[in-house]
């Protein structure tokens, strides 16, 4: 069942808190870009896209291509809150050995459909 507007707004607040906590704990990152993308990703992942955290490789899922990889914290938060991995893992952002690095690596984390770095890279991947 899809969340209503109030639930989506509440999720947006949780994701914003996650981003601030993650980048503060990491001592680095791009919180501004991540914060500017919250409503977009929450709307897509919780109200529009067809995906299943229990089956991250489901062939018929909708795919999300993050072109500006430096805003990975917002994507990580949305994936965790969707159930792809534990929310507690968010505080490992940019730590040695963490699956959550500054730019997403699709082989390191379930739910990622591309690895990104350079701005605009996603245009050719989509």
Question: PLM features: residue spans?
Answer:
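N-terminal hydrophobic or amphipathic helices/low-complexity stretches enriched
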Residues: 1-15
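A short, structure-level motif marking secondary-structure boundaries and short turns
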Residues: 4-5, 25-26, 61
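Cofactor-binding active-site loop characterized by glycine-rich and histidine/acidic residues
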Residues: 19-22, 34-126
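A broad, low-specificity signal for short, low-complexity segments enriched in glycine/proline
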Residues: 1-3, 27-28, 88-90
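N-terminal capping segment at the start of a domain
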Residues: 12-28
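Histidine-centered catalytic micro-motifs
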Residues: 31
């Amino acid at each position: 069942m899809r969340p209503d507007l109030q639930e989506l707004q509440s999720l947006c607040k949780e994701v914003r808190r996650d981003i601030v906590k993650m980048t503060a704990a990491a001592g680095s990152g791009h919180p501004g870009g991540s914060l500017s993308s919250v409503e977009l990703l929450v709307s897509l992942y919780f109200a529009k896209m067809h995906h299943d955290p229990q089956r991250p490789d489901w062939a018929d899922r909708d795919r999300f291509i993050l072109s500006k990889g430096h805003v990975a914290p917002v994507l990580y938060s949305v994936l965790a809150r969707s159930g792809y991995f534990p929310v507690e893992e968010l505080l490992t952002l940019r730590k040695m050995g963490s699956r959550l690095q500054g730019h997403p690596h699709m082989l390191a984390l379930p739910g990622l459909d591309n690895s990104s770095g350079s701005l605009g890279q996603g245009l050719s991947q989509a």
